[in-house]
Amino acid sequence: WKIMMIERLGSAAEESSNGFNNAGTGHAGFMEPNYTKETVKDGKATVTHEKIVTICEQFMLSRQYWANLARKKLIADPDAFIHQSDHIALGIGEDQVEFIKKRFEVMKKLPLFDTIELALDKETQEKWAPLIWEGRDPSDKVAMTRIKYGTDVDFGALAKEKVKAFTKVGGDLRLFTEVKDVKKQADGRWLITTKSNSVKGTQQIKAKF
């Protein structure tokens, strides 16, 4: 197989993956409450955990993959694009505080999340995230959980490194090229019509997939 990558811009990762357009969170389920839904089990209110386990496992596999690419000298040292960062989930108001507490009770029993910490007091919360209490009413109900080995990822830098790796192993990168049409042929292959800034007219490429 030969693989071709077609990029409309002059370099890869300049849109969604660009650092200015991407939050950079390493999504591992550590601090995303929407991955844990409230439910009732054995007559007791709790939260689901299946989705956070799946997401965390997927992210850990991604980290292993990046580390393997780095070991093979195909991408830069991971320190160039991934950094350890606290991941904090925040709940404000009685309902959210109760949800964060339920979430904590479920997560701390799971091996992937057993280092999770819960803070219900203002003093600890100010140490974890000082700005949360700036200008806030001291009577507010606030809950936080923290996992200290979360990550911040520069997905733009990572994507550029992976594109470099792609070309190192023989990948064909076409910059300033836009896909104009994609049609499946009778033989099951695909006819790709492209337009490049450097060539007049359109070009056609046949691909297996």
Regions found by a protein language model. Give the residues of each.
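Glycine-rich FAD pyrophosphate-binding loop
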Residues: 1-18
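Local beta-strand N-terminus motif with an aromatic residue
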Residues: 2, 74, 207-209
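Short, flexible, mixed-charge acidic loops at enzyme active sites
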Residues: 19-23, 134-135
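Dinucleotide-binding Rossmann-like beta1-alpha1 core, especially the glycine-rich loop
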Residues: 21-127
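Helical element adjacent to the flavin cofactor pocket in flavoenzyme catalytic cores
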Residues: 144-209
